[in-house]
Design a protein with these regions (language model features):
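Membrane-interface helix-boundary signature
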Residues: 23-34, 74-84, 111-115, 137, ...
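Hydrophobic alpha-helical transmembrane segments of polytopic
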Residues: 30-40, 88, 117-125, 144
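Cytosolic juxtamembrane helix and N-cap/initiation of the first transmembrane helix
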Residues: 17-49
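Membrane-helix boundary connector in multi-pass membrane proteins
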Residues: 127-144
Length: 164
């Protein structure tokens, strides 16, 4: 399965990517930045799964400026909110893990497809999530999104020569 997945990802690489010299690879600083940011996404996702009460209090503080508001919604509603947080967390664990491996293998090797995979996935998450947050009046989540976006935007900008 892993070999098959690597072959699929490898098809994104162009002949130009294969001919890149080691000098055209991103610096270790930026690769490490991507790795830490990706691990942070996965860790945050895991926190959403394993610490439901902490997660509810955190999002309650973020949205309502009070740690107990979400828990006052009623038992069934709180259970459902915890489920949604856990599902979101699981997706974030998967996405963060994938980003980590793309950065460690493709991007670190100077393969431009690695840069594009990271950039496209971050933008594909950021735009709809942030747009809905703003349209629904939850600007606080948009601010949280902006912080996560910046974790990837900075090294993407620094390594933008690899995007071709």
């Amino acid at each position: 399965m892993v070999a098959h997945s690597a072959a699929i990802i490898g098809t994104f690489a162009t002949q130009r990517d294969a001919a890149m010299t080691p000098g055209s690879r991103p610096s270790k600083f930026w690769i490490n930045w991507f790795l830490v940011a990706s691990a942070g996404v996965a860790a945050f996702g895991l926190l959403l799964v394993v610490a439901p009460a902490f997660t509810r209090r955190g999002f309650s503080m973020l949205v309502y400026a009070s740690p107990g508001d979400i828990d006052s919604f009623g038992a069934e509603q709180v259970r459902y909110i915890s489920l949604v947080h856990a599902v979101l967390g699981g997706v974030m664990v998967g996405w963060g893990t994938a980003l980590f491996h793309v950065a460690r293998s493709l991007l670190a090797g100077g393969v431009s497809a690695g840069w594009r995979i990271i950039a496209v996935s971050v933008v594909a998450w950021f735009v709809p999530d942030t747009a809905y947050s703003l349209l629904s009046g939850f600007w606080q989540n948009a601010l949280l999104n902006a912080a996560f976006f910046a974790l990837f935007a900075v090294p993407l900008w620094a390594t933008r020569d690899l995007r071709r």
